[in-house]
Amino acid sequence: MNVVRTLLLVLGFLSAPLFALTPAITLTSVPPMGSINNLSGLASNVTPAAYRVAVYIFVQGWWSKPTNAAPLTIIQNDGTWTCDITTGGADAYATKIAAFLVPQSYTPPLLNGTTTLPAELDTSSVASVTTTRTSPNAFHWCGYDWDVKTSGGFLFGPGPNLFSDSTNNVWVDASGKLHLRITSQNGQWYCAEVISRREFGYGTYRFFIDSVVDSLNPNVVLGLFTYDDDPTSTGGHRELDVEISRWANAADTNNAQFVVQPYQITGNLTRWAIPVGAAPTTHSFTWSNGRVDFVSHNGNFVPPPASVPQITTWSNTGGSIPAPGNERLHMNLWLFNGAAPSDGQQVEVVTSRFAFIPLQPAVPSVQSVSLDATGTFHLQLTGAPQLWYLLESTPDFGTWNPMGMTIAPEAGFQLMDATASSATRKFYRVSVLPGQ
């Protein structure tokens, strides 16, 4: 009897769960941007009948429910669920999608355009997931990945305007130069905008503009700026701008401005003039803790000791300087107030390079070294795209001799010494060129 009782106790213990599984929600099928297909997912470690899914989409700066008529999505017995997220307007062009696993009895907030999701969704849900959709025409340029903005035939800001991701509006040519173009098609004007996939934070943002931009049509704006979709972020969307435009005032002798948002605050904006016919030009801003320094050059910037004439500089240390967060880098070409170019002509701006220089660039790491049959020394490194690197050599650690400089086209790059020889001892060092 004692043996049997003991065995039953052991079996009873083993049949009980050792620990509770954590509820989870995942997205199993996310339709590409522009698609009207449904969103699908999986709820795990919950009783399906006791829970529902609340889905929200983020379109052009606003969170909303795809439909107020069916605010909660039913979970099937196997944990799968499907939601129609394109119930009207520009829903197909949502850049973010959020799904919350909530109790069946929960009444979710019905959002028809708010800048942030209510905090109650986090406290009321047992699990959540958010995804960011990328552009179907995303591309790689200057060492980084970029999305192309499209409004799908709807008016989006800034402007508002129609934005197109067509290769008639945004493309990289065979020389590696980025083209942004405002086009006219079937009586409609389409603008262009690209957005970096990553945030960069503190450092120098440098734009090498090939085109003559002092004479842009008065209704046209060229914007080079950081921007955080979250309006509650410090510093007015963490927006720092180089903007080239006369803002529809053809008589304005100034054609450009540096801005720390919000621009309405006194001292957060300065206007200036790009010289007539100046091309190429280089426009930069260095963002650091509590400070931003802007500078524009008449020509392609190169590090010292070379020099390029400065057009203007401006520094701001006011209270609007943001700290880094989830800002992305934007480059756009658009129409002020959505007004067509006054001359009726299409507009194009070509940018040869973009470079980001961290405040303290890291020393590149060596991936491999080799000496080929011709005696050329090859050094494969990993650093930062578009930075200048200097290769030097020495036979005895006395005098270091410069062997050459290069701009790293990608994070991985190569330096070479054609004068190397297996019969001669040499030591090498690689450094980030100062003054970038």
For the regions a language model picked out, list residue spans one by one.
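Bacterial N-terminal signal peptides
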Residues: T6-P17
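Ser/Thr-rich low-complexity repeats and stalk/linker segments
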Residues: L21-T134
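Extracellular/lumenal carbohydrate-interaction signature centered on repeated Trp-anchored short motifs
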Residues: P32-M33, I195-Y205, R271-A279, P322
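Aromatic sugar-binding interfaces of carbohydrate-active proteins
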Residues: P66-W81, D91-Y93, V102-Y106, S135, ...
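Low-complexity, Ser/Thr/Pro/Gly-rich disordered linker/stalk regions
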Residues: T134-T232, G236-A248, A306-P309, E327, ...
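Short tryptophan-centered beta-strand motifs in secreted/extracellular beta-sheet-rich domains
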Residues: Y205-F207, A279-W287, V292-S296
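Glycine-aromatic-enriched beta-strand/loop faces of beta-sandwich-type recognition domains
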Residues: P231-A279, R291, W334-N337
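Short, composition-biased motifs enriched in small/polar/acidic residues
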Residues: P361-Q436
